């Protein structure tokens, strides 16, 4: 049963809302505009109003799944729920529907922590807003927030949960490697 849940988590995470919604509503292929990333920040560059919906749906695809599994006691341990979350994030980053070329996993990663650790969620948003307000770089804000939540996770969770969240965070940070290079070279574009 757990294997089926993991497969479902991956497939749900693989739904490329940024691609689908920009194709349907903006008549554009998100993979061919802006940063070419299949995520909410790039959608913002194409259609500001649509970006909020993409963000919510990318968060929801992991948050609703984990919340439901937890609430209905289908998956009982936090460790197993973290594995489900990790598969959702993997699906978002490497979606089967787009030849394994997806987004960076930040929003889907937020969806993982919403039902599991409210403190991590608060730290994520505070650090993201603080960094963004001072720099206007969405990528740097995400990187700082992921690192901050990793620290909080190690301080508040069991070793296995912290390890699983670290794996998830490393995947997300790895997807930001080009942003990191551009930030170092001072070539990264600000959002606003």
From Swiss-Prot:
TM spans (from-to): 1-21, 49-69, 80-100, 110-130, 143-163
Pfam families referenced in this protein's UniProt entry, alphabetically: G3P_acyltransf (PF02660)
Any GO BP: phospholipid biosynthetic process
GO CC list: plasma membrane
Membrane-topology annotation of the record: Multi-pass membrane protein
EC class name: transferase
Subcellular location as annotated: Cell inner membrane
Pathway: Lipid metabolism; phospholipid metabolism
GO MF, any single term: acyl-phosphate glycerol-3-phosphate acyltransferase activity
InterPro entries: G3P_acylTferase_PlsY (IPR003811)
Alphabetically ordered keywords of this record: Cell inner membrane, Cell membrane, Lipid biosynthesis, Lipid metabolism, Membrane, Phospholipid biosynthesis, Phospholipid metabolism, Transferase, Transmembrane, Transmembrane helix
EC number: 2.3.1.275
Residue stretches in coiled coil: none
Family statement drawn from the similarity comment of this UniProt entry: Belongs to the PlsY family.
The protein's role, per its UniProt record: Catalyzes the transfer of an acyl group from acyl-phosphate (acyl-PO(4)) to glycerol-3-phosphate (G3P) to form lysophosphatidic acid (LPA). This enzyme utilizes acyl-phosphate as fatty acyl donor, but not acyl-CoA or acyl-ACP.
Oligomeric form and interacting partners: Probably interacts with PlsX.
HAMAP family membership: PlsY
Annotated NCBIfam families: glycerol-3-phosphate 1-O-acyltransferase PlsY
Protein name: Glycerol-3-phosphate acyltransferase
Source species of the chain: Anaplasma phagocytophilum (strain HZ)
């Amino acid at each position: 049963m757990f294997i089926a849940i993991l497969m479902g988590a991956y497939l749900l995470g693989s739904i490329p809302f940024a691609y689908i919604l920009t194709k349907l509503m903006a008549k554009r292929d998100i993979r061919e505009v802006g940063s070419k990333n299949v995520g909410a920040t790039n959608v913002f560059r194409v259609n500001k109003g649509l970006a909020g919906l993409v963000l919510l749906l990318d968060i929801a695809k992991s948050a609703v799944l984990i919340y439901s599994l937890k609430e209905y006691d289908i998956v009982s341990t936090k460790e197993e729920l973290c594995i489900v979350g990790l598969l959702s994030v993997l699906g978002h980053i490497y979606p089967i529907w787009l030849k394994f070329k997806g987004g960076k996993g930040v929003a889907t990663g937020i969806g993982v922590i919403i039902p599991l650790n409210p403190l991590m969620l608060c730290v994520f948003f505070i650090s993201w807003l603080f960094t963004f307000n001072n720099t206007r770089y969405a990528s740097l804000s995400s990187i700082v927030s992921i690192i901050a939540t990793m620290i909080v996770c190690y301080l508040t969770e069991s070793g296995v949960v912290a390890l699983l969240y670290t794996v998830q965070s490393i995947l997300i940070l790895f997807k930001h490697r080009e942003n990191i290079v551009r930030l170092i070279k001072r070539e990264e574009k600000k959002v606003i």
